[in-house]
Amino acid sequence: MEQPSIYNYSWVDFVFSVIGVFTFFVDWGADVWVATEFYRRGDFFWFGVLVGLMVLSSVLVQMFSWFWLQYDRGLPDLQTGGGTVLFGDRLRLSCLLHVLQLGFLCRHISAIRQGFRVWWRKEEGSEYAFYLSHDLSMLRLIETFSESAPQLTLMIYVMLRTQRARAVQFVSVAASTTSIAWMVVDYHRCLRSFLPDKARQGWASSLIYFLWNLLLIAPRVAALALFASVVGGYLGLHLLLLWLVFVTWAWLQRTHFMDSPGGEWLYRATVGIIWYFSWFNVAEGRTRGRSAIYHAFITADGAILLVTWWCCREPVQAEPYALALLLTLLLSYLLGLLFKSLYYCCFHPTLWRPPAREPGLPDDLPDADVTFRHLSIQDGAPASRPLNRRMALHAADFYSARTS
């Protein structure tokens, strides 16, 4: 099958790779700075919680990176084409780097190295550059919901408990929330790269997708922080119970993202964390039904969280902002659902899978009915160029709509 134009690596792609490394160091530095501030002020409990979140998130990301490195060692085209992760061909050294929590950084450096070769030196290998960038997009999404979202909840909780907040803290909360929503958009654009060019995500589609994620994630995080401000450690029990429900649901959907049973259970456990904050499609078929079930569940859960906060709050401290905050969260959530409905009605492409044959399909299929360009990879056919199979299959699941 002829390969599409996805492999035209440009200077924009290279810049995004550089920005990825820059944000990696900025995020790491910000985490260290916040942890240091907690320690200096004697807030050793919050210092421990923050460091714990950083360590757990880093270990989770490194585990995914290591699993994928092992899976990709069996791909001869990737190994001989210069598309390997830095030190990926040296097993012991690569293992040591992942133990030292440097595997994610090595992937960023590898993406820059390969991108520079393709863009500046005009060497072949665009497909390898995209292979690396697709993995990075997924790893950044995992880091976002395993570290950034919990840290944002912690930040808002501390502000509520101490009843003290500086302007820089409000700016930090707004920036963190925006960053989380944008990372979801970036991941979605990565998935769209596996669809035909006509289905690429335009600016209008990106804006709508960003807005509904921002308007749904923000009240979710705020509701969790408000609940924690009146019940304290019971938020951990709440997280555990919902996480078990979500992991079970992911198992029932028979996910197949990883290439080993252990890796697949790690993925399902991670999906449980992501679902605690935001919707994330993981299985083949129409997404609207599962999305409706998820949002109905999260809406009911959010209502319980906010009612608990309202009944248990300290009226003297919370009265000046309680009603306004409650109405703002409700309005934000309703607007988020509205924008999401608008996106799925007008912008979301559906992967149409022909029952028998692919050749001879018309070239003027509408955006809502497109054919997955790498369907032959999913069916086990060999490819002339390397393809990030796990991300391609995930894109197929995300957009698929089976026909009889």
From Swiss-Prot:
Keywords for the protein's UniProt record, in alphabetical order: Apoptosis, Cell membrane, Membrane, Transmembrane, Transmembrane helix
Membrane topology: Multi-pass membrane protein
A GO cellular component annotation in the UniProt record: plasma membrane
Protein name (record): XK-related protein 8
Species this protein is from: Tetraodon nigroviridis (Spotted green pufferfish)
Catalytic reaction(s) noted: a 1,2-diacyl-sn-glycero-3-phospho-L-serine(in) = a 1,2-diacyl-sn-glycero-3-phospho-L-serine(out)
Subcellular location: Cell membrane
InterPro entries: XK-rel (IPR018629), XK-related_scramblase (IPR050895)
Family: Belongs to the XK family.
Function description: Phospholipid scramblase that promotes phosphatidylserine exposure on apoptotic cell surface, possibly by mediating phospholipid scrambling. Phosphatidylserine is a specific marker only present at the surface of apoptotic cells and acts as a specific signal for engulfment.
Primary location recorded for the protein, binned into one broad class: membrane
Gene name of the encoded protein: xkr8
Presence of the UniProt keyword Cell membrane in the record: yes
TM annotation in the entry: 14-34, 44-64, 167-187, 206-226, 227-247, 263-283, 292-312, 319-339
GO biological process, any: phosphatidylserine exposure on apoptotic cell surface
Organism domain of life: Eukaryota
